[in-house]
């Protein structure tokens, strides 16, 4: 059985009023689906798909796999230049420290905490 959280559109709207990013989660039984096989399915559809796995750090840290595709923003740095590419095609190049740029970008987003989800269920990776 699968379940989508939030369960109703009204619940989604209520959460959206609290922040700018609402995690939309679908829980499915996947006994035979590994993170790598799931990634391979997603990768076929999106050239910018990614898989991040935590394998060290105990139960609190090392139990999650993050799959993603079609990123909202891509940030790259080369030397003292930082390149920002948005999903809408806008691009900019900055001459600022990378961490300062990342802090500013993160201020644009306020993730909503949803009861029952892991501590990190959406955001920048």
Model feature map: region roles:
Residues 1-125:
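Signature of the chorismate-utilizing enzyme
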């Amino acid at each position: 059985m699968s379940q989508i959280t939030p369960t109703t559109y009204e619940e989604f709207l209520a959460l959206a009023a609290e922040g700018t990013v609402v995690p939309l989660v679908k829980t499915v039984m996947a006994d035979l689906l590994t993170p790598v096989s799931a990634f391979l399915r997603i990768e076929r559809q999106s050239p910018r798909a990614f898989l991040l796995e935590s394998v060290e750090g105990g139960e609190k840290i090392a139990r999650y796999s993050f799959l993603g595709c079609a990123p909202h923003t891509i940030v790259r740095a080369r030397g003292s230049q930082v390149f920002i590419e948005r999903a809408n095609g806008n691009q900019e190049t900055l001459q600022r420290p990378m961490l300062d740029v990342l802090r500013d970008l993160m201020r644009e987003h306020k993730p909503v905490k949803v009861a029952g989800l892991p501590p990190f269920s959406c955001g920048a990776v």
